[in-house]
Amino acid sequence: MPPLADASTETLSPAEQAAVRHPEKAHRPDQPIARKPDWIRVKAPGSPEWVETQKIVKEHKLVTVCEEAGCPNIGECWAKKHATFMIMGDTCTRACAFCNVKTGLPNGLDPHEPAHIADAVQKLGLSHVVITSVDRDDLADGGAEHFAQVIRAIREASPKTTIEVLTPDFLRKDGALEIVVAARPDVFNHNLETVPAKYLSVRPGARYFHSIRLLQRVKELDPTIFTKSGIMVGLGETRNEVLQLMDDLRTADVDFLTIGQYLQPTRKHHAVEAFITPDEFAAYAEVANAKGFLLVSASPLTRSSHHAGEDFARLKAARLERLGR
């Protein structure tokens, strides 16, 4: 019997750790982990700036998606003192086949978390911050009010910091989206993750067209907020399916599209069906730009929050250019 979900995993094998973090995947047959191609290589973290970022995160008892999702860009981002904070705990109520975040029954919300996040943003001197969360289907509003509290706390502590939220879908949470939008983040990101044909096997707890409508509704509520969405490729999707997804996002007036390579966290997760080449990513970016997105980022190591601050500046410039200013 595997240890309980809150037990220490330091002495466990990789397979045992996976069972602790992902008990809902224990029944899945092991999937082979393919060798990464030469174009997917990152430097190991360990710079003084990386260590300082890690220290601030730990001192404030914060959770980052950089760590929980096993992001390959953590060394680069933390060296620049960039971190994506994951609020409302480290335990998700869903069990997506691609995701390395722990699944289970989450704890209650920490009322001090907004202040802790705001203090960390101030100490890191962030000009742009990304706030994401686990899915909290157990909460009546899906955690929307907590998102709003975090946004307001950052605004008070660090008024010049621009704020990007990467939210869950708030499925069956009436009024939740409106609460987050009313707090006026600068960027509202919600990832589609994959094409609709793959939802049942990759993202079974979500609904593709609900996510499209969520993004469209943000623009209806506040057209000044930039909207953003991201997908992974290499999950078995076809090129035509990706192009149709681009059209769906443009119909919802989404400003920014990110496309990155799916990387398999453990043998219990969805297998990598293909490694997309840099040239294929460049071709996707060319098509997406032609379809009218303000900004497109497509590469093997592209992730939703990678270079988010620089991308926000580019988004603002692209909007002004399109408006002829």
Swiss-Prot record:
Biochemical pathway: Protein modification; protein lipoylation via endogenous pathway; protein N(6)-(lipoyl)lysine from octanoyl-[acyl-carrier-protein]: step 2/2
Compartment annotation: Cytoplasm
Protein name: Lipoyl synthase
Domain of life: Bacteria
Homology family: Belongs to the radical SAM superfamily. Lipoyl synthase family.
Cofactor note: Binds 2 [4Fe-4S] clusters per subunit. One cluster is coordinated with 3 cysteines and an exchangeable S-adenosyl-L-methionine.
Keyword 4Fe-4S attributed: yes
Keywords, ordered alphabetically: 4Fe-4S, Cytoplasm, Iron, Iron-sulfur, Metal-binding, S-adenosyl-L-methionine, Transferase
Cofactor(s) the protein requires to work: [4Fe-4S] cluster
Ligand binding ([4Fe-4S] cluster 1): C66, C71, C77, S305
GO cellular component, one term: cytoplasm
The keyword Metal-binding belongs to this UniProt entry's keyword annotation: yes
Organism: Beijerinckia indica subsp. indica (strain ATCC 9039 / DSM 1715 / NCIMB 8712)
Record region (Disordered): 1-32
Binding-site list for [4Fe-4S] cluster 2: C92, C96, C99
TM ranges: none
